[in-house]
């Protein structure tokens, strides 16, 4: 299920565009997630009160959290699959503290793909989308394996 060197290069090329504005991309990803899967908003006490897209766009906290999410994901992607040290604490907090189901990680992966395609269509064609999907699936599978070790049925 690993990615080839060429696939990792596609992933990291588009990720370079994301890093130019992590907070903006992250905010868009979270807004997309909450819009397409409103049930996910319930896991975020800090954002539950945000009911409209305009409220979400105006939220500095949402922007900060988007930055945090994509910063962590970027660190994982740059490890090109050798990300156990990054995955363990993330899985620990998401299983025991936040109780985030793996399904929600699928939802945010879909949101990431959507946002990258809408913001960077020239750099995120079918090959890059397929590579990113594979990288995000690898990430989810490794999180799920850690969840299982922790006894979390997410």
UniProtKB/Swiss-Prot annotation:
If you read the UniProt record, what top EC class would you report for this enzyme, in one word?
A: oxidoreductase
Chain residues that bind heme b: 94
Main role? Monomeric heme protein which primary function is to store oxygen and facilitate its diffusion within muscle tissues. Reversibly binds oxygen through a pentacoordinated heme iron and enables its timely and efficient release as needed during periods of heightened demand. Depending on the oxidative conditions of tissues and cells, and in addition to its ability to bind oxygen, it also has a nitrite reductase activity whereby it regulates the production of bioactive nitric oxide.
The record's catalysed reaction(s) read:
Fe(III)-heme b-[protein] + nitric oxide + H2O = Fe(II)-heme b-[protein] + nitrite + 2 H(+); H2O2 + AH2 = A + 2 H2O
Modification type Phosphoserine: residues: 4
Q: In the record, what terms sit under GO molecular function?
A: heme binding; metal ion binding; nitrite reductase activity; oxygen binding; oxygen carrier activity; peroxidase activity
Q: Name positions with the PTM Phosphothreonine.
A: 68
Cellular location(s): Cytoplasm, Sarcoplasm
Q: Where does nitrite bind?
A: 65
The entry sums up its family as follows:
Belongs to the globin family.
GO cellular component terms listed in the entry, alphabetical order: extracellular exosome; sarcoplasm
Give its E.C. classification number: 1.7.-.-, 1.11.1.-
Gene name in the database record: MB
List the protein's name: Myoglobin
């Amino acid at each position: 299920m690993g990615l080839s060197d060429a696939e990792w290069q596609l992933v990291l090329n588009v990720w370079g565009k994301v890093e130019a504005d992590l907070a903006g991309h992250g905010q868009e990803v979270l807004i997309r997630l909450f819009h397409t899967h409103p049930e996910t908003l319930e896991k975020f006490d800090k954002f539950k009160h945000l009911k409209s897209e305009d409220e979400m766009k105006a939220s500095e906290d949402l922007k900060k959290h988007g930055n945090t999410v994509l910063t962590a994901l970027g660190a994982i992607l740059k490890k090109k699959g050798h990300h156990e040290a990054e995955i363990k604490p993330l899985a620990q907090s998401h299983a025991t503290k936040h109780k985030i189901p793996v399904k929600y990680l699928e939802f945010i992966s879909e949101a990431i793909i959507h946002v990258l395609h809408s913001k960077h269509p020239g750099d995120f064609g079918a090959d890059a989308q397929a590579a990113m999907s594979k990288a995000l699936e690898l990430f989810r599978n490794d999180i799920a394996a850690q969840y299982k070790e922790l006894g979390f049925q997410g």
